[in-house]
UniProtKB/Swiss-Prot annotation:
InterPro entries: Glyco_hydro_13_cat_dom, Glyco_hydro_b, Glycoside_hydrolase_SF, Malt_amylase-like_C, O16G_dom_2, TreS/a-amylase_N. Its EC number is 5.4.99.16. It holds the Pfam family Alpha-amylase. Substrate binds at D60, H101, Q165, R195, H305, D306. CDD domains: AmyAc_TreS. Ca(2+) binds at N100, D167, Y201, L202, E204. This is Trehalose synthase. One of its GO terms (biological process) is carbohydrate metabolic process. PANTHER family: ALPHA-AMYLASE FAMILY MEMBER, MALTOSE ALPHA-D-GLUCOSYLTRANSFERASE. It comes from the Bacteria. The active site is at D197 (nucleophile), E240 (proton donor). Catalyzes the reversible interconversion of maltose and alpha,alpha-trehalose by transglucosylation. One of its GO terms (molecular function) is maltose alpha-D-glucosyltransferase activity.
Amino acid sequence: MDPLWYKDAVIYQLHVRSFFDANNDGYGDFEGLRRKLPYLEELGVNTLWLMPFFQSPLRDDGYDISDYYQILPVHGTLEDFTVDEAHGRGMKVIIELVLNHTSIDHPWFQEARKPNSPMRDWYVWSDTPEKYKGVRVIFKDFETSNWTFDPVAKAYYWHRFYWHQPDLNWDSPEVEKAIHQVMFFWADLGVDGFRLDAIPYLYEREGTSCENLPETIEAVKRLRKALEERYGPGKILLAEVNMWPEETLPYFGDGDGVHMAYNFPLMPRIFMALRREDRGPIETMLKEAEGIPETAQWALFLRNHDELTLEKVTEEEREFMYEAYAPDPKFRINLGIRRRLMPLLGGDRRRYELLTALLLTLKGTPIVYYGDEIGMGDNPFLGDRNGVRTPMQWSQDRIVAFSRAPYHALFLPPVSEGPYSYHFVNVEAQRENPHSLLSFNRRFLALRNQHAKIFGRGSLTLLPVENRRVLAYLREHEGERVLVVANLSRYTQAFDLPLEAYQGLVPVELFSQQPFPPVEGRYRLTLGPHGFALFALKPVEAVLHLPSPDWAEEPAPEEADLPRVHMPGGPEVLLVDTLVHERGREELLNALAQTLKEKSWLALKPQKVALLDALRFQKDPPLYLTLLQLENHRTLQVSLPLLWSPQRREGPGLFARTHGQPGYFYELSLDPGFYRLLLARLKEGFEGRSLRAYYRGRHPGPVPEAVDLLRPGLAAGEGVWVQLGLVQDGGLDRTERVLPRLDLPWVLRPEGGLFWERGASRRVLALTGSLPPGRPQDLFAALEVRLLESLPRLRGHAPGTPGLLPGALHETEALVRLLGVRLALLHRALGEVEGVVGGHPLLGRGLGAFLELEGEVYLVALGAEKRGTVEEDLARLAYDVERAVHLALEALEAELWAFAEEVADHLHAAFLQAYRSALPEEALEEAGWTRHMAEVAAEHLHREERPARKRIHERWQAKAGKA
């Protein structure tokens, strides 16, 4: 693990209580958070900061802790607190370490109140409230003094915050030891970091401000030392130090203090610069924040669970901020403004996007407050700061899909009135809208993650642009450069960038990957109101692969009809959610939908294709196993191997060309080489991890030199078969489960495979097994070969000639009869294994379920679990027999067409007679048989309108009409 992971992080701050209620008691809980991890993963955050969830009387939203080792029951139990699933998704977890104070209900304080208690010095006591006179009161709206008299102790106790939060006495070694033990307890449970709440106030000394004392700095260093001695590097401390930069710098030490600290003074000055339309406040604070150790990092934020603090601004600046952002006094609290981000910006989308761009590109680790990604609002009429801590707005239902508890049972009411009401602002409404705030944030976070090192670890150089309404800076890391420009004005601005030092480099816009003219000196740009732009500065030779403007691109004539897909990077930017380029993915999925409409094996012509998962199966050239959802009149999931190649290659499956990164996409379901690669990787013992699931596989058998494709999804080589579950309908899962239990010598039992695993869910993506010696064929192909040999014997004879067909079709009829016997024995075995309650278990597939090898018929696959009448299975196989007749006749002389129906009926009769003889107890219904044949014929015609399918459909529709 990279011990500097926190520099590349995107932190999502949430209150478990506010996020999602799984047990419907009105309070969010850990199970609710677990269920919403996929949403956070899709959003693109990779670190969770959980606000206090410990035992507490909740007088200060959980920051008043009464037991550090217990979880507040409304959130769940200690058993519910597990970081495993978050870690499995690549997410870190940071929790609160409230080490300055406890609740008055904490057993430590209750014991300390008693006369002569050995725990008396765990808190700060005085006989007079005059001690530490002159130390400021932080919550002036609620407290008049830092001392409160306790009648039990007959003394005053010290509290820097609320009266019910007595400060711990860090001069007591026992207190420090106890807090270390609390930290160890949660770190042992897998927590990756701790936010040190209210850290500047640990010690008190007469004649000082009792803030940022040297003793506090040393205590922080001891805390880090204890953490690293026990766990090594990798777990972090994030300090809440609401101070000026020069007061915060000592907390970093020489790299032996905290790993991160909030840049509190920068945050209000971002809002100040926006309203003043002048970059000065931002530049000033960025310069003040320089000089931290190489391993340290600033944490950046726009809003959080507290007020927008104006403690660290001048009196004039505070007056300006109140007038600009909170003219109504009800939005003011303590020395700050209690508003969420979007209302603070007056609902202005451009200003929101601009500030988000600054948050994600300035030097530091960004923190996103829950709900701000969709533009949630606030409720100033709730007490204290609760107005910005309301339930997450998941949908527009009565209580925002946060909980099914009665409305009155909710811990806080959701925002239900005005433009930020959950009726209008919710995840459900924004998730599928590519123009929503949520989609904007997902795209930007994907870009941030794609360039995590430069934004998280790179240097920042401010550019001296003459136009002060424009903020411009360069981020550089290990030879990579990104230029960020932002217009703080509500009007369009033109400006010149002093880029003389970068002459010859080409600015490439990061979102579109569109190259701009090379730098030749001062660089003229124009940005719209509150606009921003990000450019990678690259050498000319590094951008030769990038596209010319779309209107100038001329594809080769043979590629003119190929769909174009914009791919600004490797295929991961289209297939990996955290790196995704939305426009390119949409173009890729549209191209896939187009090619899948042409697949005869697919029983659905998709109007829309969605990517559910993707695993990189091979690095060079990049090959991904994808799980797709197809939509039309119904939904269907398929698994397809997709390969991207920078050069055009021989072989099937080409379906799109890429620009940005020029190359070609191939769908490999018909490529024999892919199936050999699959066997080879499984032979090694394959294990991989996508964003969604684990992929594990094995193949105990040999890997043949050559593999032949028998049909889409099924391939075989010498002694080996491999089957890919192209259609994920559960058929392979049933095959793996049931075939080993069938006591039939002609059943090919699976011996290996590839499996998709996510928690308790598991599905089979591929199966492998052994074959007897010989050259196998798909049974449909084998039947067609026999027909091509048999049908020419009918030349010169008239249809209806007695005794003609049994002699001419002897070999074909023998194969069909064998198939009838096999199906009968299979039905009997399936009934014994799966039971017959609710209908007979069916094969559920056509001839593709079987292989032919040296005249023998082998079962290799079952369809999805289905129950019904045996006539349905008989019809599926009989339809394939009849289609083989038509395809063979299409390849022969026209004069033989007169025999089409007679040959089909003869083979059907042989098939049914063989089935009846092998399973006499199963009574077949002629009417049911005819109806099922008509239904199967209609289904196949819907898949693909070819002449053979059309003729068969017309014949059976006529028969069904007569029946």
